[in-house]
């Protein structure tokens, strides 16, 4: 197998994350990554034998007996998806990324391995990594065998994409795991969106029909609490304040 010398970049990666030059949010995930780094980074294999890979994947250039490890080539989609290697103008427009949004189960690949690969290539690093938790269904892990998997497309078909976005931002803790139930979803949908926002829009629209209203073209100041929540990726707290 071929290996990437990740150990060479241990001190640099640790300093980047420790000083928030590469910001990892929330703090618990930052601590988790730093603990992993300080335990000692080992070089990792970037290829598999063709037999082990069951003949599936991208061959290592110059060595047809080896297949590139999925995580090694797959992470680069963040760049190739925005022009890297074929459209330099597009790549410079979108890279480096302001934020990577990832699940907590793949944090090491993004906050350690990917960063080491970019440092090795002399390429710009993403500015921050926001790590979210998992979503359960009715207090249980989603499972086909349990039949409790939530199909987001079914929810969107019935309620619309904005309603689902609202629920996920408002109800799911940004810095931890969350839970989805149709009961709670419909409760928020009716209370916050239909009755709250919906009634407000309906009443204002009715006034517009009968009265000539003038609006001041000024930015709405939502307060420092909302701003701070958004900067910390605490979308649930920000929406609660609004």
Where are these regions (language model features)?
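Long, non-coiled-coil amphipathic alpha-helical linker/lever segments
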Residues: 224-236, 240
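Structured secondary-structure scaffolds
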Residues: 1-216, 240-242
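Acidic, turn-prone loop/beta-hairpin segments
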Residues: 212-229
């Amino acid at each position: 197998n071929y290996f990437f010398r990740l150990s060479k970049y241990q001190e640099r990666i640790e300093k980047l994350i420790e000083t928030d030059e590469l910001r990892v949010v929330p703090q618990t995930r930052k601590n988790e990554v730093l603990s992993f780094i300080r335990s000692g980074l080992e070089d990792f294999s970037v290829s598999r034998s063709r037999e082990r890979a069951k003949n599936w994947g991208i061959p290592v250039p110059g060595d047809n007996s080896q297949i590139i490890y999925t995580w090694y080539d797959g992470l680069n989609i963040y760049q190739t998806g925005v022009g890297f290697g074929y459209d330099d103008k597009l790549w410079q427009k979108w890279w480096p990324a302001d934020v990577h949004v990832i699940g907590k189960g793949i944090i090491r690949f993004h906050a350690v391995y990917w960063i080491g690969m970019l440092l090795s290539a002399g390429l710009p690093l993403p500015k921050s990594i926001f790590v979210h938790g998992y979503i359960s269904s009715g207090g249980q892990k989603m499972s086909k065998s349990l039949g409790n998997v939530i199909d987001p497309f079914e929810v969107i078909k019935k309620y619309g994409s904005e309603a689902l976005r609202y629920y996920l931002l408002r109800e799911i803790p940004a810095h931890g795991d969350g839970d989805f139930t149709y009961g709670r979803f419909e409760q928020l949908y009716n209370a916050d969106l239909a009755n709250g926002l919906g009634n407000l829009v309906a009443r204002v629209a009715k006034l517009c029909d009968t009265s000539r209203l003038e609006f001041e073209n000024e930015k709405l100041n939502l307060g420092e609490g909302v701003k701070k929540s958004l900067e910390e990726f605490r979308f649930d707290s920000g929406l609660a304040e609004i």
